Amino acid sequence: MGLKKFKPITPGLRHLILPDFSEITKEEPEKSLLRPLKKSGGRNNFGHVTTRFRGGGHKRLYRIIDFRRDKDNIPAKVASIEYDPNRTARIALLHYADGEKRYIIAPEGLKVGDIVMSGENVDIKVGNNLPLKNIPDGTLIHNLELYPGRGGQLVRAAGTAAQILGKEGKWAYVRLPSGEIRLFDLNCRATIGQVSNVDHQNVSLGKAGRSRWLGRRPHVRGSAMNAVDHPHGGGEGKAPIGHPSPLTPWGKPTLGYKTRKKRKPSDRFIIQRANDKKEK
């Protein structure tokens, strides 16, 4: 996969950088694995906005992704690498030996024709899924389970990878993409390799309209609002925010303010927080 730059024929092309989609091998998705996807526009069941700056965008169909990888010891052939509008990673269509078809998150380097498997003692090979207890230290992994059997919940975004640092007792030490070092049950499963579309972080949309196509509405600064609408609003000209620290629209501290609950039960699994030099 690479990136595509454009000649500045129009203002919208001047800063546009897009993926070249060279890894995509099939344009039409597998019909049996599609489901309707209703847009919420950032509203909840009462119709109240719960997520600002969302709405519109191109209509999408949801692709059912196999995050559990629970079809053990049955080889699957990679039939295609496809685009998924609902995530940043590419997805791979697997044809299992028994005839079943499933989508998985495509790891970097997976190609059409490759054979992948999941199970307790499968080979350490890109795309294979197995428990942490059977994966060597130092291996890059993705689609990582938080709890055994629940399915992969972590490390699913484009270009991300976690790394197994070591094992002790019934726990594995894993460094997550954020830098956090955390304990995981050795029976938690993960997929070998790094998530595909590693150049996603270098994409530049080039114009506001392209954000609208993705369902993102303009993100208005608080300082550009009236005082009635935001704590940062009001004042003459470009006024300072007028508070000791930045605040959310609802008056809560933000930008660096710690929001994690004190004495959260899962604290005992976190060995080192992201960007924290000292170990607990």
Curated annotation (Swiss-Prot):
Disordered as annotated region, ranges: 229-280
GO biological process assignments: cytoplasmic translation
Pfam families assigned: Ribosomal_L2, Ribosomal_L2_C
Family: Belongs to the universal ribosomal protein uL2 family.
Entry keyword annotation includes Hydrolase: no
Name of this chain's protein: Large ribosomal subunit protein uL2
Source organism (scientific name): Dictyoglomus turgidum (strain DSM 6724 / Z-1310)
rRNA-binding listed as a keyword: yes
Record's keyword terms, sorted: Ribonucleoprotein, Ribosomal protein, RNA-binding, rRNA-binding
Free-text function comment from the UniProt entry: One of the primary rRNA binding proteins. Required for association of the 30S and 50S subunits to form the 70S ribosome, for tRNA binding and peptide bond formation. It has been suggested to have peptidyltransferase activity; this is somewhat controversial. Makes several contacts with the 16S rRNA in the 70S ribosome.
InterPro entries with a match to the protein in the record: NA-bd_OB-fold, Rib_uL2_dom2, Ribosomal_uL2, Ribosomal_uL2_bac/org-type, Ribosomal_uL2_C, Ribosomal_uL2_CS, Ribosomal_uL2_dom3, Ribosomal_uL2_RNA-bd_dom
PANTHER family registered for this protein in UniProt: LARGE RIBOSOMAL SUBUNIT PROTEIN UL2M, RIBOSOMAL PROTEIN L2
A cellular component term, taken from the record's GO annotations: large ribosomal subunit
Known partners and oligomeric status: Part of the 50S ribosomal subunit. Forms a bridge to the 30S subunit in the 70S ribosome.
One GO MF term attached to the UniProt entry: rRNA binding
